[in-house]
């Protein structure tokens, strides 16, 4: 999978507005891509940070690529995976999510000095 494939998969005609099937599909897609990287030696896994606001359920997805020096503060890279209404959202923000997925894939095989946290934010 590459960046273009990820953008295409995320920027569909369903949109990714919170509470829609497209939003749920985007979350499942990101989780699937992260799970496919789990076998990599330096990817410590991912977790979901679920919350509820205004009657809606939200879920931030976080993955850490651990570094050697735990005394150094981690670097945080993030992008939101929801979109407004039924818009496909290639530029808002599927492209940035695709870049984060590629960063996870590239860093998963690297031994880093500093930890990196990748955050896929919900609305």
Regions found by a protein language model. Give the residues of each.
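Alpha-helical metal-binding/catalytic segments enriched in His/Glu/Asp
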Residues: 63, 77-123
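Soluble non-cytosolic domains of exported or imported proteins
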Residues: 1-4, 17-28, 90-98, 110
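A non-catalytic alpha/beta surface segment that caps or lines the substrate-entry region
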Residues: 5-66
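Extracellular/periplasmic catalytic domains that process cell-envelope and extracellular macromolecules
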Residues: 2-3, 54-57, 68-71, 110-113
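Solvent-exposed loop/turn segments at secondary-structure junctions
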Residues: 17, 48-49, 68-70, 81-85, ...
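Loop/turn elements at helix/coil->beta-strand transitions in domains of secreted/extracellular proteins
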Residues: 5, 37-39, 71-75, 112-117
């Amino acid at each position: 999978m590459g960046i273009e494939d990820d953008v295409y998969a995320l920027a569909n005609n369903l949109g990714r507005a919170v509470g829609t099937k497209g939003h749920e599909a985007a979350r499942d897609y990101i989780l699937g891509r992260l799970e496919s990287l789990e076998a990599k030696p330096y990817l410590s896994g991912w977790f979901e940070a679920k919350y509820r606001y205004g009657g809606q359920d939200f879920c931030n997805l976080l993955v850490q690529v651990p570094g050697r020096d735990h005394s150094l503060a981690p670097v945080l890279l993030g992008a939101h995976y929801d979109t407004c209404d039924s818009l496909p959202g290639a530029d808002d923000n599927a492209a940035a999510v695709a870049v984060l997925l590629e960063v996870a894939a590239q860093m998963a095989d690297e031994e880093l000095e500093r930890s990196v946290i990748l955050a896929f934010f919900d609305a």
